[in-house]
Structures are given as structure tokens and as C-alpha cells.
UniProtKB/Swiss-Prot annotation:
GO terms for molecular function: tryptophan synthase activity. It is an enzyme of class 4 (lyase). GO terms for cellular component: cytoplasm. The modification N6-(pyridoxal phosphate)lysine is found at K91. Belongs to the TrpB family. The keyword Cell inner membrane does not apply. The gene is trpB. Tetramer of two alpha and two beta chains. Pfam families: PALP. This is Tryptophan synthase beta chain. Keywords: Amino-acid biosynthesis, Aromatic amino acid biosynthesis, Lyase, Pyridoxal phosphate, Tryptophan biosynthesis. The lineage of its organism: Bacteria, Bacillati, Bacillota, Bacilli, Lactobacillales.
Length: 407
């Protein structure tokens, strides 16, 4: 299949587009023009590649998780180690690319939204590197959950604005950042952290994150002597690490692609962020995509143990993959993610982010189904340092509840 998305209007099949007020249209058109110019300029990519090598530490390893594979007794599991990037997650791939683009556009200030804080830290890091002013918008609820990342951002010279609107999480931070961009368009670039928002953001983020899949494809060949893995697994919130892994394989039809959504307390409760499992198409933050909404089209609150996955929408390209059945999207509960978190830590000595733990949990199930002749690549999108205290508290609370139940 020849995959040519997006079209000139920013649509991936029937999803995507540019649903923004007139005040923002100038900015997104300016951004698209600058991005097309950078794509045509070899020096832009050369400079970015050099930074990715020398500053970020790419390429990241593709690691055969032998212990985990043997423990499960199924398909071979290879981990794409995005947790080993500078700042501890895949987010830096996009942040660095966009700050470099903004610098070339002559912008002076950077703004961004963040949920778990990883995109905020990555953006603040890139802004420090390029000596640019930086403000990060973060839902008040996430500020509490991720105090360590808030301090990191401030340490890197960024100003962190706690957003008190709505449910005080990621979608509210995006709203606040977009409002700020409208008011400061001339000298400010807004760095969206995931593969969503109005065109050209989903395409830009995908392109900067596709380094994950391009490296993994070549590394898999070098490691195994085989052409392609049988499956890919990555967690999806907005979906940037997943689209980065999936996109370079999209025309390889023999490769099954699985995105793991946050099922929270279960998809039959109101407490989840399983957008493709339970949502339907709607416009959010400038793009037509699958969205969690009620019968009246009001956006529902998303819920997940992982701050990076509780977004009520998903990038339009994922909605398109789902629509054309190129990828499958499966719900993984908080409890399953916690099991994945502990299992990888115990068996491989790698503490994954709670986001990535959703992918690990599903990979364990999939490995059993596929059997030992098959193999898969799992995107380990980030490291779990930021989540250790939260997991400790949660496991202690669960143990106390069990103790009370047995008393």
C-alpha cells in the first residue's frame, strides 16, 4: 500500500485538518511554510542529526529482553530504549526539532503544554540549549502528581504555569497554551508535545519522532538477520511515541501494530482514557480525531494512573490507522500497567515509565499468543524514575486494603 498521508489540507483519511480560529490560522500557515523550507534544506537535518547524536545520545539501543522473553516463554521481545535518551524519554526528539525550527523562524519565546512533565522537561531543556525564553503550561492536578518534573523545568530556566481551569489536567494545559499563543503569535512558537493539534503539528511531531522506527527497523535487521518483526507495541496517549515507531513500518503489511490505551479502572467505568475503544470522532484542539465525549458532544474527563496518557483524544493519524484497520488499539488497565512496571523492573533491571508499562503489560499477553517463533519490538518510551514514589504509594495502599479485607 502506498501511504501518502496527510493530504495538502492536513487530513489523514477523514481525520485531522485545521480547525482553528482566524487568529491562529496565520501562525499555523507560517509554521507549515517554515517546516516545508526546513524539509528542503539539508543543513537543517544535518544540524538536527548532529544534536540527536551528540546531545540526546542517539541512536538508542534495540535491546533483546532475553530474561523477559524466557520468563514468558513466548515471542522474542525487543525493547526500543527511548528511556535512555537525554531527559529520559522520547519527548526530546520532537522538542529539539521544534525548538531548532522556531530558532530558524526567528522566534524568541517557546511555550508548551505538559502532562507527565516529560514534554515540559524536554522543551525546557531544548530552550536552554538554544537560549530561548520558555513557559510551560501544566494542569494543577499534574503539578501535584509530578512535583519533581516541575522542579526540573524551573531548574532549566522555564516558568511553569499551573492551570486551574476544568479538570486541571493535560487538555486544560493545551487550552491555556493555545490561548497564550494567540496572544503572542509574533515572537512565540508553541511546541505541541504529541502528534495532535491542527495541521501541520501531527505531521511535524510524527516526522521528528519517526527516528524511533527508522532506527528500530535497521537495528532489528542487524541484530536478527531477519527483515521485519512480526509486531510492534507502543503506548498511546496523544500517540507520539507510537506514531514514531509505527510510521516507518506502515507499508510493511506483514507487521502487526498495537497501540495500548489507558483503560484506567476499566473501560466499562467512567475512569479511563481509552479513546479508540470508547470514543467517537469529534474536534478537539484544532483537529478532527476520536474523542471521549458524552451524548451532547461534551468532552469527558480522561483518567489514568499515568499522567502522560490521560488525554481524551488521540492523534488523527492513529484514528486513521484504526479506521483503515492498519493498527489495533487495545485497552490496558492501571492494575495491568502496575504489573508490567514491576515485572520489567524485577526481570530485566529496567524501571519503565508508567506510560511504557501499559505497552509492556500488553506485550506479555501478545508474546504468549504469538509463540516462540515470532518476535516483536516494544517501544520503551520513557524511564520510571518520575513514577517510583507514586507506584510505591499505590502498592502500599493496595497492600493495606488487602490486609483490611483479610482482617
Amino acid at each position: 500500500m502506498a501511504y501518502q498521508e496527510p493530504n495538502k489540507d492536513g487530513f489523514y483519511g477523514k481525520f485531522g485538518g485545521r480547525f482553528v480560529p482566524e487568529t491562529l490560522m496565520t501562525a499555523v500557515l507560517e509554521l507549515e511554510k517554515a517546516y516545508r523550507e526546513s524539509q528542503a534544506d539539508p543543513s537543517f537535518q544535518e544540524e538536527l542529526n548532529q544534536l540527536l547524536r551528540q546531545y540526546v545520545g542517539r541512536e538508542t539501543p534495540l535491546y533483546y529482553a532475553k530474561n523477559l522473553t524466557q520468563h514468558i516463554g513466548g515471542a522474542k521481545i525487543y525493547l526500543k530504549r527511548e528511556d535512555l535518551n537525554h531527559t529520559g524519554a522520547h519527548k526530546i526528539n520532537n522538542a529539539l526539532g521544534q525548538v531548532w525550527l522556531a530558532k530558524r523562524m526567528g522566534k524568541k519565546k517557546i511555550i508548551a503544554e505538559t502532562g507527565a512533565g516529560q514534554h515540559g522537561v524536554a522543551t525546557a531543556t531544548a530552550a536552554a540549549l538554544f537560549n530561548m525564553e520558555c513557559t510551560i503550561y501544566m494542569g494543577e492536578e499534574d503539578v501535584k502528581r509530578q512535583a519533581l518534573n516541575v522542579f526540573r523545568m524551573e531548574l532549566l530556566g522555564a516558568k511553569v504555569e499551573a492551570v486551574t481551569d476544568g479538570s486541571r489536567v493535560l487538555k486544560d494545559a493545551v487550552n491555556a497554551a493555545l490561548r497564550s499563543w494567540v496572544a503572542n503569535i509574533d515572537d512565540t512558537h508553541y511546541i505541541l508535545g504529541s502528534a495532535l493539534g491542527p495541521h501541520p503539528f501531527p505531521e511535524i511531531v510524527r516526522d521528528f519522532q519517526s527516528v524511533i522506527g527508522r532506527e528500530a527497523k535497521q537495528q532489528y535487521r542487524d541484530l536478527t538477520g531477519r527483515d521485519l518483526p512480526d509486531a510492534l507495541v507502543a503506548c498511546v496517549g496523544g500517540g507520539s511515541n507510537a506514531i514514531g515507531l509505527f510510521h516507518p513500518f506502515v507499508e510493511d503489511e506483514s507487521v502487526a501494530m498495537y497501540g495500548t490505551e489507558a483503560a484506567g479502572l476499566g473501560v466499562d467505568t467512567e475512569h479511563h482514557a481509552a479513546t479508540l475503544t470508547k470514543g467517537r470522532p469529534g474536534v478537539l484542539h484544532g483537529s478532527l480525531m476520536d474523542v471521549l465525549q458524552d451524548a451532547h458532544g461534551q468532552i469527558l474527563e480522561a483518567f489514568s494512573i499515568s499522567a502522560g496518557l490521560d488525554y481524551p483524544g488521540i492523534g488523527p493519524e492513529h484514528s486513521h490507522y484504526h479506521d483503515i484497520k492498519r493498527a489495533s488499539y487495545v485497552p490496558v488497565t492501571d492494575e495491568e500497567a502496575l504489573e508490567g512496571f514491576q515485572l520489567l523492573s524485577r526481570v530485566e533491571g529496567i524501571i519503565p515509565a508508567l506510560e511504557s508499562s501499559h505497552a509492556i503489560a500488553f506485550a506479555v499477553k501478545l508474546a504468549k499468543e504469538l509463540g516462540p517463533e515470532k518476535s516483536m519490538i516494544v517501544c520503551l518510551s520513557g524511564r520510571g524514575d518520575k513514577d517510583v514514589v507514586q507506584v510505591k504509594d499505590r502498592l502500599e495502599a493496595d497492600a493495606a486494603k488487602k490486609g483490611e479485607a483479610h482482617a
